[in-house]
Amino acid sequence: MKPFTVLIPTTQNVVGFTDITLEDQDVSPIICVNNNMTPLSISADYNNFVCAPSGIIEKYTKLSSYRIDLSSEIDSGESWQLGFFIAHIINHFGKLVFSQENQLILNNMDHILWCSGLINSHLEISDVSYIKTKLLISKSVFDQAIEKNKKILICVSNGNLDEVKTFLNNPENIHYKNYISVQSFSNAKEIFTKIKFPKNIFKDKMYLSKKSLNMIFLLIFLLITIPIFAFVYKSSSNYLTLNELKDNNNHIQL
């Protein structure tokens, strides 16, 4: 599997992941900036985003507590959801390349995803606002990508696609043509197909869960029924033996 870097554009700046740490199960998920100890204001929303039954991260990773460190703040909105989901899944397989506080694009980053979108519990992607602003804010990052000969895939909803195309087709941005591409998606799962990440990562997890559940039901059924059958068999055998003794007059008479 190829390694990937995920970038989250906001109306203020472009944010990268500097670390994702697995925490103890009883600890609430939080978001911080560059290993600081103060959680960001969106940590409560992130908790709902991660933890079952409302969240989607625990559903696919079976893990419920993380600490995310970002290169800079995200203080509001929900358009971070798509990028966070993609980053979590890629990181779960050990293929997320982290940014640094003052350097979002490193020399060892060959596959970069720029993600902005809102997702629901079925991973369906909804449109978000301020795409044009986010693209303009991202121009310095796009220029860094060109300097380092890196390519960026912009991932957005179907409804936000035209805004991105308009930006890329602007004569002022023609130099991005060979380095930055855009693809729209209706569901976050489609992104993993596009980037050629294992296509069955979601299907296999669901299949394994159902298979494990069926095995548990089978074991419970056997644990209940085997003792019952054994008792019935033993009782029937004793009854038949007693009848044979009576029929053969082999019982003791006093």
What is each model feature region?
Residues 1-251:
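Peripheral, non-AAA+ core regions of ATP-driven protein-machinery
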